[in-house]
A protein has these predicted regions:
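Structured segments of extracytoplasmic/periplasmic soluble domains
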Residues: 193-197, 207, 237, 241, ...
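N-terminal secretory targeting modules
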Residues: 1-175, 182-183, 188, 196-199, ...
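Active-site segments of SGNH/GDSL-like serine hydrolases
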Residues: 250-255, 286-319
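Feature marks short, surface-exposed loop/turn motifs that line or immediately flank catalytic pockets
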Residues: 116, 211-213, 255-257, 306, ...
Length: 381
């Protein structure tokens, strides 16, 4: 038996709003269980928050669907023996281990109650068929269902970065690391694709933040949700994933598409535009540190950007040159799975563009998941 993470998120700063604080609010997150386990612990983080945070209580229960419905075995988690937990700015806390049996394909429902004014800066936005969250006014942690009149869905996950399960030795985790493309649907579809193929001993863990770059990060609030640069997030995000064997890195497109010149955007100077060697060095940084954690690491090629709002041929060229480098490494060729070369530029294949010419469609995310599973499990490179 061993500990394996069955759920995970990166940490960033949320999109800025005049209201930075919440009071008397319940957060609820349903989590898919990929395999059976007998004990449970969760990790909460305030990694990107600059004020201390107190959570009054954290409640878990079982569920039968990706919804807010708690079905049975409702219990409080404790932190150093207390129901309440406190995190310093940029800090974290791990719950006490609890004996809690979960079956494969069940759902774990995690609810957190924020009693006093709480800085909600530290969080991340995620989407996908296995990703959902809720907030509700008042303490509804023990409610079987959240009140319809005082609750709403949200894609923002606050504080919750890891759920760890004590499980059989054959079970393990795959980490998917990246930016908005990975914070969106394909890791969830990968988990579903594994299940479709009766590969039932793998948990897919997402560690991704929209807008992140390998080499740089923003210091302004308009882009605070675009997260930390690679050297400020990579080690922190992967080192806490229990039972991980494999890492997939799909990162670098924002380094290429963001710089436009201060005449267009004061926060995006053209001097931020990386060279090919700088991008390679950034990827080598990831690979060198991944070795420390004994991870089998694959890199994902960057997907098409043709007709994106900052598209230019020089961006196309460096993207394609970077992809050629990535293909010399153990890699998953997402670019050719959902894109095609037309007149020296990669376009999305029919049905694979979400509409913004940068992010894949749901069909494309499914194809990316299939490509990832084929590569990792069928040696189909």
């Amino acid at each position: 038996m061993k500990w394996v993470s069955i759920y995970g998120n990166a940490q960033s700063k949320v999109t800025p709003h005049p209201a930075k604080y919440a009071k008397d609010v319940t957060l609820r997150y349903p989590i898919y269980i990929p395999f059976e386990g007998d004990k449970l612990s969760i990790r909460l983080e305030n990694f990107c928050g600059d004020e201390d945070v107190k959570i009054e209580s954290v409640v878990i229960s079982k569920g039968h669907s990706l919804s807010d419905k708690q079905t049975d075995d409702i219990r409080n988690l404790t932190f150093n023996g207390s129901y309440a937990c406190e995190m310093k700015a940029h800090g974290s806390i791990i719950s006490d281990v609890i004996d809690y049996h979960l079956e494969e394909d069940e759902y774990l429902i995690i609810s957190m109650y924020l009693k006093e004014f709480t800085n909600l800066t530290s969080g991340v936005n995620i989407t996908g068929p296995l990703s959902k969250g809720y907030f509700a006014y008042g303490n509804q942690t023990l409610n079987n269902e959240l009140d319809l009149n005082t609750s709403m869905k949200t894609n923002w996950v606050y504080f919750l970065t890891n759920v760890d399960l004590y499980t059989s030795d054959e079970n393990y985790a795959i980490i998917c690391y990246g930016d908005s493309i990975t914070s969106q649907d394909w890791p969830d579809y990968m988990q579903l694709e594994l299940k479709e193929r009766n590969i039932n001993n793998v948990a897919v863990i997402r560690k991704a933040v929209s807008g992140t770059r390998i080499l740089r990060e923003y210091a302004c609030i308009p882009y605070q949700s675009y997260g930390l640069k690679g050297e400020n997030r990579f080690i922190h995000e992967i080192e806490h994933v229990k039972g991980a064997k494999t890492l997939i890195i799909q990162h670098g497109i924002n380094d290429i598409i963001h710089p436009v010149g201060t005449d267009v955007n004061i926060f995006r100077p053209l001097s931020d535009m990386p060279t090919l060697d700088e991008l390679k060095d950034g990827m080598k940084y990831y690979l060198e540190h991944a070795k420390r954690f004994n991870l089998d690491t694959y890199v994902g090629t960057l997907v098409p950007i043709y007709n994106w709002r900052t598209y230019a041929i020089f961006r196309e060229n460096i993207k394609n040159e970077f992809n050629q480098y990535l293909l010399t490494l153990p890699s998953i060729d997402f670019n050719n799975a959902i894109g095609e070369l037309i007149d020296e530029a990669y376009h999305f294949k029919d049905g694979c563009d979400s509409g913004d010419h940068l992010h894949p469609s749901k069909l494309a995310y499914k194809l990316m998941a299939i490509k990832a599973v084929d590569t990792l499990f069928n040696n189909n490179k």
